[in-house]
Amino acid sequence: VEAFLGSWKLQKSHNFDEYMKNLDVSLAQRKVATTVKPKTIISLDGDVITIKTESTFKSTNIQFKLAEEFDETTADNRTTKTTVKLENGKLVQTQRWDGKETTLVRELQDGKLILTCTMGDVVCTREYVREQ
């Protein structure tokens, strides 16, 4: 987990609007969300991980222990049962709600944080660079 710690700024995004459509995010929310460049801050206190996402649109904050299910309220106001696991050096976050499921995988590639979001057959990638 230590390699993920720090502050990350969104640099580029691919297929985010399609991904949000699959989540049933409203057109107005999608328009705003695709224009902002959020910052993600990942920290660790003992065995509790915090992932804070900050933007001018909406900020979220989740705290969890690896492999323990918790209740999450997402940026688009879904209430999910969420689990985060460390698998092959990747942080794999699974959100479940209303019989649906989406997966958010965070991994490090060439010093960048790559977030791959999958919902059904739609895959979105978001690339973050470490802030100094």
From Swiss-Prot:
Q: What is its main location?
A: cytoplasm
The signal peptide here is none
Matching entries from InterPro entries are given as:
Calycin, Fatty_acid-bd, ILBP, Lipocln_cytosolic_FA-bd_dom
Q: Does the keyword Lyase apply?
A: no
Task: Identify residues that carry N-acetylvaline.
Answer: V1
Q: Which UniProt keywords apply?
A: Acetylation, Cytoplasm, Lipid-binding, Phosphoprotein, Transport
Q: Known Pfam families for this protein? A: Lipocalin
Instruction: Give the UniProt subcellular location, in the record's own words.
Output: Cytoplasm
Q: Which GO terms describe its cellular component?
A: cytoplasm
GO molecular function list = lipid binding
Give residues where Phosphotyrosine occurs. Answer: Y19
CDD domains recorded for this chain? Answer: FABP3-like (cd19443)
- Belongs to which family? Belongs to the calycin superfamily. Fatty-acid binding protein (FABP) family.
The record's PANTHER family line, in alphabetical order, gives: FATTY ACID BINDING PROTEIN
- Record's domain comment? Forms a beta-barrel structure that accommodates hydrophobic ligands in its interior.
Job of this protein: FABPs are thought to play a role in the intracellular transport of long-chain fatty acids and their acyl-CoA esters.
What's the name of the protein? Fatty acid-binding protein, liver
Q: Which organism is it from?
A: Ginglymostoma cirratum
